[in-house]
């Protein structure tokens, strides 16, 4: 585990391809990471465009794997990479999880979405949570950085996008460590570890120079 890792979350629609590939890369690098989907259900390619394979969130990847490999179309799923994707997922965590049901996961420092619609849904949900928060709750609001990195939903682009996400998280982590060391060196005890909005925007701008193929959006929300 990376020392002093941010609590990170990756999000796509079905929590199967883009968010899971970036989850894997961040996990392999030692970061504290979870992943979720914003869709109403887990929709995966089927024998035709109008016949997807649909599962409820929480259906174990092992069950999805067994179902797909038992179908008469399993050769198609092998050739289009679907079986490979589910096999990868079941070695990362138990089942796809829905973003809107993740209150028990606690608060994240950084949420990275992989599609603009997911970005909007995450922001909307966090706003609803804040509005519905118990008025008697005096807990200090915690900022969460929401970054969207637009990734095409196929296996190859998910790998490319995952590498880009890992690079960005490495930059953010290095920035935090440098700031922390500076405070220790100069006894700046009154400064917090929180990355400010303008600091994050500068990091994103620097990252974007090397990742022009991955458009980004950025916002800050609160718990």
Swiss-Prot record:
Q: Which Pfam families match?
A: Ssu72
Report the catalytic activity.
O-phospho-L-seryl-[protein] + H2O = L-seryl-[protein] + phosphate; O-phospho-L-threonyl-[protein] + H2O = L-threonyl-[protein] + phosphate
State its location(s): Nucleus
Q: Indicate yes or no for the key word Hydrolase.
A: yes
Looking at the keywords, is Hydrolase present? yes
Its keywords, alphabetically, are: Hydrolase, mRNA processing, Nucleus, Protein phosphatase
> According to the UniProt entry, what is the EC number of this protein?
3.1.3.16
Q: What GO annotations for molecular function exist for this entry?
A: protein tyrosine phosphatase activity; RNA polymerase II CTD heptapeptide repeat S5 phosphatase activity
Look up the domain of life of the source.
Answer: Eukaryota
GO biological process: any one?
regulation of siRNA-independent facultative heterochromatin formation
Q: Which InterPro entries match?
A: RNA_pol_II_suA
Q: Would you name any one GO CC term? A: mRNA cleavage and polyadenylation specificity factor complex
> Subunit structure, per the record?
Component of the cleavage and polyadenylation factor (CPF) complex.
What task does this protein carry out?
Answer: Processively dephosphorylates Ser-5 of the heptad repeats YSPTSPS in the C-terminal domain of the largest RNA polymerase II subunit (RPB1). Component of the cleavage and polyadenylation factor (CPF) complex, which plays a key role in polyadenylation-dependent pre-mRNA 3'-end formation and cooperates with cleavage factors including the CFIA complex and NAB4/CFIB. SSU72 is required for 3'-end formation of snoRNAs.
The Swiss-Prot or TrEMBL record describes its family as follows:
Belongs to the SSU72 phosphatase family.
The protein depicted here goes by the name RNA polymerase II subunit A C-terminal domain phosphatase SSU72
Q: Which organism is it from?
A: Debaryomyces hansenii (strain ATCC 36239 / CBS 767 / BCRC 21394 / JCM 1990 / NBRC 0083 / IGC 2968)
């Amino acid at each position: 585990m990376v020392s002093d890792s941010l609590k990170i979350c990756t999000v796509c629609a079905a929590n199967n391809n883009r968010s899971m590939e970036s989850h894997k890369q961040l996990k392999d690098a030692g970061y504290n990471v979870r992943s979720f989907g914003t869709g109403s259900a887990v929709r995966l390619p089927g024998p035709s465009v109008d016949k997807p394979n649909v599962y409820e969130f929480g259906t174990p990847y092992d069950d999805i794997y067994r179902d797909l490999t038992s179908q008469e179309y399993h050769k198609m799923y092998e050739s289009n990479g679907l079986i490979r994707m589910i096999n990868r997922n079941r070695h990362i965590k138990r089942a796809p999880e829905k973003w809107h049901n993740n209150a028990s996961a606690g608060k994240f420092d950084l949420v990275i979405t992989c599609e603009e619609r997911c970005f909007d849904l995450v922001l909307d949900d966090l706003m609803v949570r804040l509005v519905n928060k118990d008025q008697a709750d005096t807990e200090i609001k915690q900022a969460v950085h929401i970054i969207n990195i637009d990734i095409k939903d196929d296996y190859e682009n998910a790998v490319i996008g995952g590498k880009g996400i890992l690079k960005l998280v490495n930059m953010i982590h290095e920035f935090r460590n440098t700031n922390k060391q500076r405070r220790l060196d100069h006894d700046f005890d009154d400064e917090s570890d929180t990355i400010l909005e303008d600091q994050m925007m500068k990091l994103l701008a620097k990252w974007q120079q090397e990742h022009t193929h991955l458009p980004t959006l950025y916002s800050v929300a609160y718990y």
